[in-house]
Amino acid sequence: MNWYSFYYQSQNFLYWPWELEIPLVDWFILIYFSAYLSFLPVFFGLSYRGHLKIAKALIVSGFIGCMIFLVYPTSCAYQRDLNEVENFKLFYSFLWTQDNPTTLMPSFHVAMSAIFLLPMAKHSTSYGMKIFYGCWLALICVSIVLVHQHHIIDIFTGLILSYFSLKIVERIKNHG
């Protein structure tokens, strides 16, 4: 989808002008990439049924997100320049080579992380773990802007997408 959108669709820009003043914080790339580990607590902490619910929510979010990308493709207004990056150049080079600056809204990075971490927080019996999962998700949300990969609206739309994806799966389970 990202490749198709980059090469074959005209892009829309959806951001507030003041967002371009937000500095790139290079070490937040570590938090950004930690999203790819956010499935681990699910793997170890939820039952098989929990895994199925999350897998279905990921499928629902992928379908809805791709429809949004096709109808209203958005692009990143930040300029990608490795000279602005002091540390972690290899990480940024990898990210910017693999991920075109398109298909931003909703953020799958946020949606995926929320689909993994919100059920973990909900099912955790430890207040400390609930806070941990919430803080991890909040940091991932902030990281997508601080590494100049997304805009602020992408955070909110990613969270909304994850919420509705989890609710749709729950509703189907209860009425199915």
Model-inferred region functions:
Residues 1-37, 83-88, 92-94:
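N-terminal transmembrane-helix/juxtamembrane module of multi-pass inner/ER membrane proteins
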Residues 32-39, 59-60, 109-116:
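Core segments of transmembrane alpha-helices
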Residues 1-5, 65-78:
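C-terminal TM-helix exit segments that contain a strictly Trp-centered aromatic cap at the helix terminus
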Residues 92-176:
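Membrane-embedded catalytic cores of phosphoryl/pyrophosphoryl-handling enzymes
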Residues 38-70, 133:
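Interfacial segments of alpha-helical transmembrane regions
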Residues 26, 30-33, 53-60, 106, ...:
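Alpha-helical transmembrane segments of integral membrane proteins
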Residues 46, 72-76, 147-148:
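Short helix-capping/hinge motifs at transmembrane helix termini and TM-loop junctions
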Residues 22, 46-48, 96-102:
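Membrane interfacial helix-start motif at the N-side
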